[in-house]
A protein has these predicted regions:
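Extended, folded cores of ATP/NTP-driven motor/assembly subunits in large transport
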Residues: 1-279, 283-286
Length: 286
């Protein structure tokens, strides 16, 4: 069983502000982006705490071979994973996404990371995993797993320093689980968002950071739909694609690996998000 942390140990880092979007670009919950993949999430408002900004960084992580383990190995994996979660003093979330993939572009971008000697083993391993998944034949769907870390800091440079500080420790913890983390830059994160907003049109994604800076383009226009209609029980997006959101209000004390495996291995696009909060330490309060 995968034991979930007690609810009372989680406290939101900032008071959530729900704003009615005035245009379709406002539905994207991101304020500013940096080339290295660090995103600022909320635009400062008159009601927000002065000098505090919310930033996050996203990583791809490799599968933990959990479903094939015996009971003793599962208990050990769960113990390690719980230790990992409790060691984090920032908010984080785990996202499992079944999406259509522009396979050639995706492989090319992952392999580009092998240019760095530090990232070469991770890039090659993930490239191998992508190939195996595509060979499984799930209607052209690729499953990606993301680990997103958030923090509150007074400015971008402080957030960058913080993420660089904790990144090695997080990667080591995932390595102990038999997994690995690959940090995503801005282009890769936008591609992941594009695969949701423009589902079925993944090959059309095009984003160039230098062009974005030179022309001062709105990056939101590169990923968002041209239309989004709210219906009573679903959202209707461009091209007739429909989506609905289901919220699990209360989890049991534990979830079996079989339940999670069946939930996230559907033969249609699905995004599963597990959002957890931890109380930030005084040092992390900025």
């Amino acid at each position: 069983m995968l034991k979930l942390l007690k609810k009372e140990t989680h406290t939101p880092q900032t008071e959530r502000i729900y704003k009615v979007p005035l245009c379709i670009q406002d539905t994207i919950p991101i304020y500013r982006i940096a080339e290295n993949g660090i995103f600022e999430l909320e635009k400062p408002t008159s009601g927000s705490k002065k000098g505090i900004h919310q930033f996050d960084r996203m990583y791809l992580f490799e599968d933990i071979n959990f479903s094939t383990q015996d009971e003793e190995e599962k208990e050990d994996t769960c113990s390690k994973f719980e230790t990992l979660l409790r060691s984090m003093n920032v908010s984080y979330k785990i996202i499992v996404s079944n999406h259509y993939a522009d396979n050639n572009k995706l492989r090319e971008e992952i392999l580009q990371k092998a240019v760095s000697k530090e990232m070469e083993p991770l890039a090659k391993e993930y490239h191998k995993m992508i190939g195996e998944r595509l060979e499984e034949g799930r209607g052209g769907l690729l499953q990606s797993k993301y680990f997103v870390v958030s923090c509150r800091k007074p400015d971008y440079e402080s957030a960058k320093t913080y993420f660089n500080t904790i990144e090695f420790s997080i990667q080591q913890l995932f390595h102990r689980l038999g997994s690995c983390l690959i940090p995503l830059d801005a282009t890769e994160r936008l591609r992941a968002l594009h695969s949701y907003y423009r589902m079925g049109d993944e090959a059309s994604f095009s984003f160039d950071w230098n062009e974005y800076l030179h022309l001062k383009r709105d990056w939101r226009n590169d990923i968002i739909n041209t239309s989004l209609r709210e219906r009573p029980e679903h959202l209707e997006m461009e091209g007739g694609t429909c989506a609905c959101v289901m919220f699990v209000r209360k989890y049991p004390n534990g979830l079996t690996d079989q339940f999670l495996n069946e939930l996230t291995n559907m033969n249609f696009p699905i995004i599963y998000t597990c959002l957890l909060y931890t109380s930030p330490s005084p040092r992390d309060r900025g």
